[in-house]
A protein has these predicted regions:
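N-terminal transmembrane-helix/juxtamembrane module of multi-pass inner/ER membrane proteins
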Residues: 1-68, 111-125
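Alpha-helical transmembrane segments of integral membrane proteins
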Residues: 11-15, 86-94, 159-166, 191
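Aromatic-anchored segments of alpha-helical transmembrane domains
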Residues: 21-24, 97-103, 168-178
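Hydrophobic alpha-helical transmembrane segments
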Residues: 63-83, 139-145, 149
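Interfacial segments of alpha-helical transmembrane regions
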Residues: 73-101
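Helix-loop junctions at the membrane-solvent interface of multi-pass transporters
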Residues: 82, 108-109, 207-210
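Membrane-embedded catalytic cores of phosphoryl/pyrophosphoryl-handling enzymes
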Residues: 118-215
Length: 215
C-alpha cells in the first residue's frame, strides 16, 4: 500500500509539472505569438527537405485530418467491440474529445498559423495554430492504444507488439511532421504533446479505475 501511494504521488507530481509547463507555454505564446525560438526551430527542421521526405511527412499527418481521424477511431472501437472488449471500445471513442479540447483552446489563444516567408508552407491548414490538434490527438489516441496493448493480455502478443510499435512511431513522429510541413510552430507541437499527456493520464486513470466493491 505505501508503495502504491508513493507511485500515485509521483504521478500527480508529474502531471502537475506537465500542467504548469503547458500553462507557462500558453502564457508565453499569448504574449509572444512569433518568437525567435520558433523561427529558428522551423528553419532547422525545414533546412534539409526533399520530395520523398515531403511525402512521408504528409502521410504521417494524413491520419489526423478529417475524415480519416474519426473513421480510424470509430473503426478501432468497432474492432474492440466485435471481440467483446466493450469497455475498451467505449474509451477509444472518448479520444475523439481531443478535438473539442484543442479547438476550444485555439479559439481562446487565437494564434495565427506559420506563414511564408517565415517558413516553407507545404500543407496549408485552417483554424488557429496553438496548440497542435494533431499532436494532442496522436498522443491521446495512439498513447491509449499502447496502454491497451499492455493491459489487455488476452490480445495475442503478435498483435500487441506491432500495434504498440506503430503507435509509438506516430506519437513521436507527428511533432516533427507538423513543423516540417509548415503547419505549426515548435511551441504549438510542444503544447499539444503536454496537453496530450495530461488528457492521456486522465483517460487512463478512468479506464484503470476499479469499481468500488458493493456493500
Amino acid at each position: 500500500m505505501p508503495q502504491s501511494n508513493k507511485r500515485k504521488r509521483i504521478m500527480l507530481f508529474v502531471i502537475g509539472a506537465l500542467a504548469i509547463g503547458f500553462l507557462l507555454l500558453t502564457a508565453f505564446v499569448f504574449f509572444f505569438p512569433i518568437s525567435s525560438v520558433d523561427r529558428e526551430f522551423s528553419e532547422e527542421i525545414q533546412e534539409h527537405h526533399n520530395q520523398l521526405l515531403d511525402t512521408v511527412m504528409k502521410a504521417i499527418s494524413w491520419v489526423g485530418y478529417m475524415p480519416a481521424a474519426p473513421i480510424m477511431v470509430v473503426g478501432t472501437a468497432l474492432i474492440f467491440y466485435m471481440f467483446k472488449y466493450k469497455k475498451e471500445a467505449l474509451f477509444v471513442m472518448f479520444t475523439m474529445l481531443s478535438g473539442v479540447v484543442s479547438s476550444s483552446i485555439k479559439l481562446l489563444i487565437d494564434r495565427p498559423r506559420p506563414s511564408e516567408p517565415l517558413v516553407r508552407i507545404i500543407v496549408k491548414t485552417q483554424q488557429q495554430s496553438f496548440p497542435s490538434g494533431h499532436v494532442l490527438f496522436y498522443v491521446l489516441f495512439f498513447g491509449f492504444l499502447t496502454l491497451l496493448m499492455y493491459e489487455v493480455k488476452t490480445i495475442p502478443k503478435y498483435i500487441r507488439l506491432p500495434v504498440s510499435v506503430i503507435s509509438l512511431f506516430f506519437i513521436f513522429s507527428i511533432p516533427y511532421s507538423r513543423v516540417y510541413l509548415g503547419a505549426h510552430w515548435f511551441t504549438d507541437v510542444t503544447a499539444g504533446f503536454l496537453l496530450g499527456l495530461i488528457c492521456l493520464y486522465i483517460l487512463s486513470v478512468l479506464y484503470l479505475k476499479r469499481p468500488s466493491p458493493k456493500k
